[in-house]
A protein has these predicted regions:
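Short intrinsically disordered, low-complexity coil segments enriched in acidic
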Residues: 1-2, 179
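Conserved acidic/glycine
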Residues: 2-62
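Cofactor-binding active-site loop characterized by glycine-rich and histidine/acidic residues
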Residues: 38-42, 46-178
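A short, conserved beta-to-alpha structural element at the edge of catalytic cores
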Residues: 178-185
């Protein structure tokens, strides 16, 4: 993806440099995330979805944009609002829905539910119901990449509540001091 000069307040033709098919794909992906969360939310309100459910409606662009810049070998960690991150990283919509309904065909065989999604095959290291818990996981994975000499990065999605957790400051400090391949969003 092209890099934008932070001092340039105008997009300066950046959007014109991206292929239209790529941009349409991003829009399609954002729509998939929005519609899937809205529909499962409607079903949850009718009592059809077991367990807790945390939706990410309105957060689609961050997930899709970040994951569009990743390579298949790159990894992500997520929050309790993980559905969009899972799908944006390449997770199967069928596996996600099966997981939310507690079915064996789910990405965690129906045991993880909405807040505990994992799919190592696509580099989705996990979502977590504990505020800020993805931060040290992302740093540990990035440290593993560094130690093994592997060329992949970790993107760590987190919410504003994580800023008040000790793990937030510890993780950012460790990542900076050791110059680890991790991006915090």
């Amino acid at each position: 993806m092209p890099r934008r000069n932070i001092e340039n307040t105008d997009y300066g033709g950046m959007m014109e440099t991206l292929p239209k098919i790529f941009l349409v794909g991003l829009l399609r992906d954002m729509r998939l995330l929005r519609v899937s969360d809205e529909r499962v939310g409607e079903r949850a309100r009718r009592g059809e979805v077991p367990g807790l459910l945390h939706l990410g409606v309105g957060e689609e662009a961050v997930a899709v944009g970040a994951c569009a810049a990743l390579r298949p070998e790159d990894k992500i960690t997520s929050t309790h609002r993980a559905h969009g991150h899972f799908l944006a990283k390449g997770g199967s919509p069928k596996a996600l829905m099966a997981e939310l309904y507690g079915k064996e065909a789910g990405c965690c065989r129906g045991k993880g539910g909405s807040m505990h999604l994992v799919d190592m095959n696509i580099g989705f290291l996990g979502a977590n119901g504990v505020v800020g818990a993805g931060l040290p996981l992302a740093v540990g994975a990035a440290m593993g990449a560094r130690i093994k000499g592997e060329d992949w990065v970790v993107v760590c999605f987190f919410g504003d509540g994580a800023n008040n957790e000790g793990a937030f400051h510890e993780s950012l400090n460790l990542a900076a001091v050791w110059n680890l391949p991790v991006v915090f969003l």
